[in-house]
Amino acid sequence: MSNHDPISDMLTRIRNASQKKHTSTSIPASRMILSIAKVLQKEGFIADINEEGEGYESKIVLGLKYSGKNRFPTIRSMQRVSKPGLRVYKNTKGLPKVLGGLGVAIVSTSKGVMSDRDARKQGIGGEVLCYVY
């Protein structure tokens, strides 16, 4: 079965794994998925990133983070914003602040995939891929 939207698939896999309190989840690898995972790690939402396999069967394994004695997921919610049927682009001033700055918007810019904070610092806009908080 082909996957038409790998970013939505990634967000769904992370959401499902964190709800079931799994320690990790695997996702089919691509450069975009790896870039998004690196932003999530930099922002403190996931613990680690490991690449497994080569070529067509390569996968990215993400270590999920939990907090507290009851293991509450660090990621409370993930929302896809720009979809294949409706792309959403914002300039620097139009980039949203997710939950008043507590969350992060992941933006695909001409200088790569980055958080909304980094895009604002560099003064560039781009395609808003998703919100994470």
UniProtKB/Swiss-Prot annotation:
The keyword Ribonucleoprotein applies. One of its GO terms (biological process) is translation. The keyword Transport does not apply. Gene3D superfamilies: 3.30.1370.30, 3.30.1490.10. GO terms for cellular component: ribonucleoprotein complex; ribosome. Keywords: Ribonucleoprotein, Ribosomal protein, RNA-binding, rRNA-binding. It holds the Pfam family Ribosomal_S8. Belongs to the universal ribosomal protein uS8 family. One of the primary rRNA binding proteins, it binds directly to 16S rRNA central domain where it helps coordinate assembly of the platform of the 30S subunit. Part of the 30S ribosomal subunit. Contacts proteins S5 and S12. This is Small ribosomal subunit protein uS8.
